[in-house]
Amino acid sequence: LDKKGGCILSYNGGKIVDCRTGETLVEKTLDPALVPELCAFAAAQDIAILTYNREGIVCERDKDEWANKECFTTKLPMIHVDDLASYVNYPVCKMLITLDPARRDAVCAAGQQQFAGRADLYPSSPFFIEAVPQGVAKDDSLAELLRRMGLTRENLMACGDGLNDRSMIAYAGVG
């Protein structure tokens, strides 16, 4: 991508980077006030929550089975911190709640109610719930990228294997 040109849309479309130049074209971050609230929500549910920094995945519950699945999937190391809410003093595009699949739907519904109008929470796999800035979605991110490039949906195809990829694939029409 850095040689022929291309972009990476990460954090469910919350960040778009031009691989040739390294320029960040779009970056939508969670309101910093939400980070401790999201951490408190996860603690009240007795589940793990994590985020990312330049070195890897940051989490209080570094032994959590589901959090370690994210490390395995992304090939990023786990970084243990004692207090995630205090540790995060930088902009974050996404926080990831990890939990037993049997609890996902109930916890997601509770989170959607608690954070309505301030952040979007949705399942991305049987054991993950994404927490992103309100309105961040992969299909919208692709639309923004096409607009910037002067292209249309006819020039687009998308690939994905997560529950949160459905809107992107439907938007592309080919995937």
Q: What positions do the PLM features span?
A:
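Short, well-ordered alpha-helix to beta-strand connector turns
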Residues: 5, 13, 92-93, 172
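Conserved acidic, metal-coordinating active-site core of Asp-based
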Residues: 35-37, 41, 45-159, 163-171
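Alpha-helical substrate-recognition element adjacent to the catalytic core
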Residues: 1-27, 32-33
